[in-house]
Regions:
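Helix-coil-helix junctions within alpha-helical repeat/solenoid scaffolds
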Residues: 1-225
Length: 225
């Protein structure tokens, strides 16, 4: 009985960690915030520190994605440092890309680009390639926001599209296509943008309440006028 009693909170923590990853994937900020608070309460109640760095990072991401940007960025950075100190290599390319995305929103484009370069290098070193498409997409958006040549922006976004297709990562493909379609729209290439995005959006049969699919639908409507 004692062993099962000890295992129970660990199982809850593991379940919360997976829920947080899923909710963050779909940019559900409120859900991520709620799950990380539940995790913190469990840690305090049972004197545990399981997933401390990982869940701390997600908590920081939720804060930075709402109205506590500076505190959120600081917590994301502290959590990354904690994971580095513990030599935890998993998640790092993904986390670096998420921090880069926050920095793009805050206008710190050079930091964002440096984080993307670091994320790609870490992915190569640790053979964690599953977020490469997202890293290239964020790199492209950082380049565009920073005023880099549009050929460089397009190169990053096309690479994001290629990688997502190679990996069969449909949601990442959709995100890359949205970013590239917006670029082409602003260049007056509306027909090309629509032809790129429409079949990718058409592949989906569910999830239409998610931010990504709503964005794709809205953009397609604009491109069709």
């Amino acid at each position: 009985m004692h062993g099962r009693g000890q295992a129970h909170p660990k199982m809850l923590v593991g379940s919360l960690a997976w829920k947080v990853r899923l909710e963050q994937f779909f940019t559900n900020v409120a859900a991520v915030s709620a799950h990380t608070k539940t995790h913190a309460a469990l840690m305090a109640e049972h004197g545990m520190n399981t997933y401390q760095g990982i869940m701390g990072f997600y908590e920081g991401w939720a804060m930075a994605s709402s109205d506590e940007v500076e505190k959120g960025i600081a917590l994301m950075q502290r959590s990354l440092a904690l994971l580095e100190a513990k030599n935890v290599a998993s998640h790092r390319p993904h986390f670096l890309s998420l921090l880069a995305q926050v920095q793009v929103r805050e206008g710190d484009f050079q930091s964002a680009l440096a984080l993307c370069a670091n994320a790609l290098e870490r992915a190569r070193r640790t053979e964690q390639y599953y977020f490469d498409a997202e890293i290239y997409r964020i790199e492209g958006e950082a380049r565009r926001a920073a005023g880099h040549p549009l050929t460089d922006v397009e190169q990053s976004l096309v690479r994001a599209l290629e990688v997502s297709r190679e990996q069969g990562a449909r949601m990442f493909e959709l995100r890359a296509a949205i970013a590239l379609a917006r670029l082409w729209r602003d260049q007056g290439r509306k027909a090309e943008a629509r032809d790129l995005l429409a079949p990718i959006y058409g592949w989906f049969t569910e999830g239409f309440a998610t931010i990504d699919l709503k964005s794709a639908k809205s953009l397609l409507a604009e491109l069709s006028t």
